[in-house]
Amino acid sequence: QPGLAHSVHPRVEGLEPGTEHFYRFRVGRELSPVGRFRTLPAAGETPESFSFGLVSCQAWYHGHFTAHRHLAAEEDLDLVVFVGDYIYEYGITGTNLWRQGAEVGEAHRVEIETLEQYRLRYALFKSDPHLQAVHARAAAVAVWDDHEVQNNYTGPLSDTGIGEEDFAHRIAVAYRAFYENMPLDVAALPEGPDTDITAGFDVGALARFSLLDSRQFRDAEPADAAEQQREDRTILGTEQEEWVGERLASSEATWNLLANGVVLVPINEKSTDMWDGYPAARRRLLAQMAEAQNPVMLTGDIHKHVAAEIPADPDEPGEERLGVELVCTSVASDGDGAEDAGTPETWTQHEYVKLYDGRRGYVHVRLTPEEMVSSFHVVDWIEADDTAPKQLTARFTTPAGEPRLIPA
């Protein structure tokens, strides 16, 4: 339909479980490249393994998508999980266009606000051949964070003081463009500034995935410490909290993975855009996670690789652990980066943080009935070109039943 920018969201039925398939699209005489995916195992079946890539934060203008080049070349890849900031809304100008050899037209030089501008921004980012290769390599699922609309927006509120009526329209067109361009079910078609991107699926009896919306239903960032500690504050909203709680409580899977946009483990109470800004909501979620086997949080947002063991008590972290959190660095946001970029001491001062690396890259995760192996890959440069080789900065094993990150 022209009203949906000619995007299609087909529901294909009757495919055999656990089977590799290839597909392409035809429009007139035009044929797309061939894509590949593997259907999920049958309900109750336990596959020998299931592997996925974890990526986020791909500011096209900050550098080449070298991480995607390496991810697409992974031999063992059943799924790609995008955990937010698939696009960025900022105007692209001489001050932030660090991708050498790239040029953009006038339409990209202003902050995007209209449906056509959001559509054009997706088209620009998706023109990257390495991102195209990732989508062709394996099935993908996605959640959003903030830049799919506006930096640090909270629920219906703009971070820059745009009036609620005007901002509601901006949310509506941003959500529409996200739906048009991302692998969402037809049930997620937005109605104005409202939609439901939460989704869940099971990898047989091996794993249960729950995709969370940590942006649309959240309360505003707190004005002071007293408000921050209020018991009724939420980041997921009441209905979504109940939904994920039911999924965790009813799960019989060995691994229970949640994907969301912002960091869960306690790091800094001043980081109010993360779960640190919603401590009561975090306590509720951790109580729900404790009901399931081997909970794992998948996160992006911070443009750093972080691997952390989740404290059972986030308010007074001791030695008891509840699960693990895997935070992937950015594909391109913040440019080349460096191993110690940012404020590593803010993170590494916590005993439960086992890795911090500020270079660009992705995470590859392999699940088996016995263990989870998480491999954190990095590249040293992305601004000059896309030729940087990948390096393994860290690999951890998490045995089933033991919420630890053991260097491997």
Where are these predicted regions, by residue range?
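Metal-dependent phosphoester/phosphodiester hydrolase catalytic core
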Residues: 1-408
